[in-house]
Amino acid sequence: MTEQENKTSLIEFPCTFPLKVMGAVHPEFEQAVLETVRLHAPDTQAHHITTRPSSKGNYTGATVQVKVENQEQLDNIYRALTSHELVKVVL
C-alpha cells in the first residue's frame, strides 16, 4: 500500500468487505446483485450473499461478503451497484 493510499483509506486492503445493498422486492434481485458484484470481483460466489425482506416487506436487503484488493475495486463495485435499476441504496 502506498503512503497516499494510507492517508485516504481507513480500510486495510486486501480484505473481505461486507457490502449492504437495499433494493426492490423482485425475484431477480439477489442474482442481479451477485452478477453486478462479479463484474469487479469474479471470485464472489452465491454463498457470499444473504438476503432478507425489510420489516414492512417493501424492500429486500442483501449483504455480500466481497474480497477486495484495493479502494479502486471497491469504488467500482459501489458505482456498478448504485447504477443498477433494482438497487436503491448501497452501504
Curated annotation (Swiss-Prot):
| Family statement drawn from the similarity comment of this UniProt entry | Belongs to the UPF0250 family.
Can you say what this protein is called? UPF0250 protein NGO_0791
Concerning Gene3D superfamilies, the annotation shows: 3.30.70.260
SUPFAM superfamilies, sorted: YbeD/HP0495-like (SSF117991)
A Pfam family: DUF493
